[in-house]
Design a protein with these regions (language model features):
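Beta-propeller-forming repeat regions
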Residues: 1-305
Length: 305
C-alpha cells in the first residue's frame, strides 16, 4: 500500500489451463518485471494488429513511475513502449474517445502533477497527447476515474474524483469532490472536453456510474475515504441523481462503514434493482466504523438506502 521508489512492480497474466477438482485453474505468466509499483493495467488492441496489448500504469513515488504499453508480438512475447515519464500515474483506462475506430489511452497522473492526459491513438502504436484537465494546485488529490457515457449522447465521457489526501496533511479538504469531463469531440476531430464539477464531498476517493433509480440514465455513486472520527454524522457514501440537462442532485446514503475507497454498481441479488458494493481501507488512526466489503440494497425505487 505504501508508495515506494523500489522497482518491485510486475504484470502477471493468468492464463486458463483447465480445471482442478471442478475449479478453474490458471497458469501465471510474468510479462513485465522490475518496474515501478504497478497501479493499473488495461487490455486493448493498441496498434490495430488484431491482438490484445496492455496499457500499464506505474505509480512509483517521487522519482519513479510512468505509463507504458506492452505490444504483443507474434511469438507471444511483449515489447515495452514508454508513453508517459512522470511519477504518480494511477489509472490507464482505454477506449475510443474521438470515434475514429482507434483505441486511445486515458492517463490519470496524481502526486504533484494532478492531470488527466488523453493519448489519442494515431495507428500502429503511435499516440498523440492532449491534456484534458489540470488541477489548480499540487494538493488537488486526483484519486480515480471511470469512462462512461454520462449524458447519454453516444460518446464516452470521463468521470473522476479528487479526494486523495494521504500526504503531509491527511485530512478531508474542502475542494474534494466528483467531476465530469463532457466529451464534445467531433468524430475524428481534435479532443474537446468540458469540465463540470458535480459535487463537493470531502475525501471523495471514487466516483462510479450506474442507474440507481431505474429511470434509464446514469447516476453517480461517490465514496469518501477520509471520514473524521470526531464527526460521526459525516457521510461516507452518497449518490448523485441524474436530473437531466447536466444537473445532478446529491443524496446521502450512509455514514458507516467509514474510509471507503472504491465502489461498484450492479444488481447483486437479482431483484432488478441496482445495489452498491464498496471497499474499505482503514489506514488513518484512530480507525472507526470498520467495514471491508459493505453492500447497500434498494428497498424502494428511489436509490440505495
Amino acid at each position: 500500500v505504501v508508495p515506494s521508489e523500489e522497482r518491485i512492480g510486475s504484470v502477471v497474466l493468468l492464463l486458463a489451463d483447465g480445471s482442478v477438482d471442478g475449479a478453474p485453474s490458471f497458469e501465471a505468466r510474468t510479462v513485465l518485471n522490475g518496474v515501478a509499483r504497478v497501479s493499473d493495467v488495461s487490455a486493448a488492441d493498441l496498434d490495430g494488429d488484431g491482438d490484445l496489448d496492455l496499457a500499464v500504469a506505474m505509480f512509483g513515488l517521487y522519482k519513479t513511475g510512468g505509463a507504458l504499453w506492452l505490444e504483443r508480438r507474434p511469438d507471444g512475447r511483449y515489447k515495452r513502449h514508454v508513453i508517459v515519464q512522470r511519477n504518480g500515474v494511477s489509472h490507464v483506462p482505454v477506449a475510443d474517445f474521438d470515434g475514429d475506430g482507434r483505441t486511445d489511452v486515458l492517463v490519470l497522473i496524481s502526486q504533484e502533477h494532478e492531470e488527466l492526459l488523453l493519448l489519442v491513438g494515431r495507428g500502429r502504436g503511435r499516440f498523440e497527447p492532449y491534456p484534458l484537465f489540470a488541477g489548480p494546485h499540487p494538493m488537488f488529490g486526483l484519486s480515480g476515474c471511470e469512462v462512461c457515457d454520462l449524458d447519454g449522447d453516444g460518446d464516452l465521457d470521463v468521470l473522476f474524483a479528487n479526494g486523495d489526501a494521504l500526504d503531509q496533511d491527511p485530512h478531508p479538504k474542502p475542494w474534494h469532490g466528483a467531476h465530469w469531463l463532457e466529451n464534445r469531440t467531433e468524430p475524428g476531430g481534435r479532443p474537446q472536453f468540458t469540465h463540470h464539477e458535480l459535487v463537493r464531498f470531502p475525501g471523495a476517493y471514487s466516483a462510479v456510474p450506474g442507474d440507481l433509480d431505474g429511470d434509464g440514465d446514469l447516476d453517480v455513486v461517490v465514496t469518501s475515504m477520509l471520514n473524521r472520527w470526531d464527526q460521526p454524522d459525516r457521510q461516507s457514501l452518497i449518490w448523485l441523481e441524474n436530473a437531466g440537462v447536466g444537473a445532478f442532485v446529491p443524496h446521502p446514503v450512509d455514514t458507516a462503514p467509514a474510509s471507503l475507497v472504491c465502489a461498484e454498481v450492479d444488481d447483486l441479488d437479482g431483484d432488478g434493482r441496482a445495489a452498491v458494493l464498496a471497499g474499505g481501507l482503514h489506514l488513518m488512526p484512530p480507525v472507526h466504523a470498520l467495514g471491508r466489503v459493505p453492500a447497500w440494497f434498494q428497498r424502494a425505487p428511489s436509490g440505495p438506502r
